[in-house]
Amino acid sequence: CALLDHTVVALISGGGMAVVTSQVLDVLTPNARRGNLHVMPTSGSRYYRWDGTQWALVYAHDLSEATVAAVSESLERHARELGLWEQQVWGPRIENRGSQITFSALGQFAPVSAKQAWDSDNTKKQALVEAVKADLPHMRARAGGYTSVDVSECGIDKAYAVRKLTQTLGIRADEMVFVGDRMTPTGNDYPAVEAGAIGVRVENPQDTVQLLDALLARFDTPAR
């Protein structure tokens, strides 16, 4: 909330709008400057702005039913073949987020500790990414969170979101700072850097909090 008092913020998440709403939007204070927040869930393939009363949809690139079925089938088949179809899960393994299909090996609601331990070197996720890409070369598959793989249309990713923001805000991409934990070339945050944004890599939520605290301290320090 405090950051919105000082600057424009874009929330570009691999999660769907329901997750973004429950984890972020629903906990904003009544006086938060929502007009300074650009909400871009499912890796930027959807875009919402506050219209004074609610979060209004600006655009959505939803997948066709045939594409959803093909992606879901490929994810499940290869996850089983690779031994990634875990028996203990917390929530659905495969989610249709409208404009993106996400595979979560332990389920969307798995404990963070379990997620962090599942694929610490990213080899499991990357193996699934490569298998799905071989099936569906016209789609983009990338490692998402600790246990997830995101599949969307080629060209509709966080780079697309950055380009949309440059148009909306009238600024250059290199005037944006993009903070993310998947900044390797195979990660779903990397396209934002490819689009020209300044990338800042964090490892976990605690890193992000420390970064925000330091940034807010700079805003609150009087100019000399």
Predicted regions and their residues:
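Active-site phosphate-binding/coordination module
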Residues: 1-90
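Mg2+-dependent phosphoryl-transfer enzymes with acidic/Ser/Thr/Gly-rich catalytic loops
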Residues: 152-154, 158-224
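Short, solvent-exposed loop/turn segments at secondary-structure junctions
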Residues: 17-18, 46, 108-110, 147-148, ...
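Terminal peptide-recognition signature
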Residues: 13, 39, 103, 162, ...
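Short glycine-/acidic-enriched loop or helix-start segments at secondary-structure transitions
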Residues: 20-22, 51, 113, 188-189, ...
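Conserved acidic, metal-coordinating active-site core of Asp-based
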Residues: 81-82, 86-177
